[in-house]
Amino acid sequence: MDLNTDIMKRIFITILSAAALLTACEEFQPVFTGKYENPEEQYIYTDEDFGGKFTSIADLKKMYVNAPVKVKGRCVIKGQVTTSDQVGNLYKSLYIQDETAGIEIKIGKNGLYNEYKLGQWIYVDCTDLTVGDYNGMINLGYEDPTKEYETSYLEHAYIIDNHVFKGEYDEPVQPVEVSEADLLKDVNMGRLVTIKNLKYGYVDSYGLNQIFILAYIDPNGDRKDYTNNCIFVDDSWSQPADRSLWVDTWACSEAKWKEYLYSGIFDNVEVAGGTVADFKNPDGTYNIGSMAYSVSQYFTMGKSGVQVRSSGYARFADTKIPAEVLDGTATVSFTGILTKYKGESQFTLIDLDGVKKADGTNWY
């Protein structure tokens, strides 16, 4: 395939990007998890189509130095797909990795698992795409015209089809086991890994046993207004005596959030100069917009904390964490994508098959 610049193609892409690109979304959103009709047979790309010359994913990530960078000149990466959005815990993105590193590709559509199979080789022409960062995680996307984020999604099919090329099918990537000492090493960020024998809960440097629920007084308001709009929950507020009311699920669907909210367990959480209870209407309902909420459940690996973040739109959002894990009588091992958020270890499950007992058998 000739990768020389096609002037008309680039002009068309520029026009489309100005008209169609949306900014990156900070939160998880609904994900189509059904099945599309089988597409027509497509061309399968091979190394020969690209002259057999590739930039490693590690070298691509090194292009980022404290600011987003638009890739210029010939730059093609090649990697295997390591994620699936079938259960809804990833949003408009997939991860690929080669022998050097892994990276998130921000493809702006749902149902990616129907098009990009686990283990399939993917080629990405990075020319004119942008390498950016989100709270410590380097990703590849399009330039965000609003400058609110460092990258946005490849929203239009024409743009996707001229940058992302499907290669041959292969066996799924095998996860690498990562130790506590390697949790925050750059080489492991964005890769499919397994971490073993974690205990539920994590006491931070302030002595708080962490659980993190991200919710908003106004879901349509400023989601970066942490003082007046965001609801953060840890055990600095009193845990209810009735343990059944505590947040013991991987995330919260909209229905589950309402169940928790109307139980009253969040009433004393401080927000916007008051408490959640202050946002009740005269009839006793809460004046808080309804949406699904992501939850980070904290676990301890050795002496390190790992937050396992799950989407309220995931099929397993309302699935309870095993009782033996919650009460500390059993440990848990995870397989999924290792990331970080503001310097702390964060983990994304692909599905509940990635949640194992100490002996390697499934919890679910």
Annotate each predicted stretch with a short phrase.
Residues 12-17:
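Sec-dependent signal peptide hydrophobic core
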Residues 26-91, 95-364:
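OB-fold nucleic-acid-binding modules
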Residues 21-24:
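C-terminal motif of bacterial Sec signal peptides marking the signal peptidase cleavage site
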Residues 1-3, 18-19:
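N-terminal leader/targeting segments
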Residues 2-11:
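Positively charged n-region of N-terminal signal peptides that target proteins for export
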